[in-house]
């Protein structure tokens, strides 16, 4: 099964309870400050369906020009991320355009212990290695700089007050968010398993269709690796219609 604009619209209209629970879970995390080096914004993080929905809603509420730009950047990210580290599509300058609805991965970055963060990094490297082999089996060798890229551990995040947060608290919050999202039943599983917890994949599939997005990604990535030319992708992105018109 795949998502359609109709299903996303239905979820946006009927998910107020789950989104309130998500807000309450986020509110239990301490407020933080950092030096705004935007290292945590190097990539769009994985997320659950319940985390993706507030951002889709926020996009729909934005002024037309900004909404169009961010959707273009997010869909462009889906096609470009195997060949280039472009930063999160919601980062502009040093500002996050969806900051109030930023994902758990953004909120927890810099709060994990260094040991736990390294464990997450090991898992991420294994996943990237598997992805590299999948592309290689299709005749595409991904750039080493992309495959080897790892968001560095950050020592610059501090809580605003005396509260100390530990891995156990963060894991509890993560589990709670997963449980809230699981309330969407099979749709939660679709997003995790078929869309790989990737908002950029979801928006691309809503725009072009699921199978067409996968085929387009293979063709565009193959061509960009072989030619180092992204003009075909740029043309596609520039001509995108307003996706949110079908979701609101």
Label each region the model flagged:
Residues 1-39, 46-95, 99-248:
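Short loop/turn segments that flank or connect secondary-structure elements
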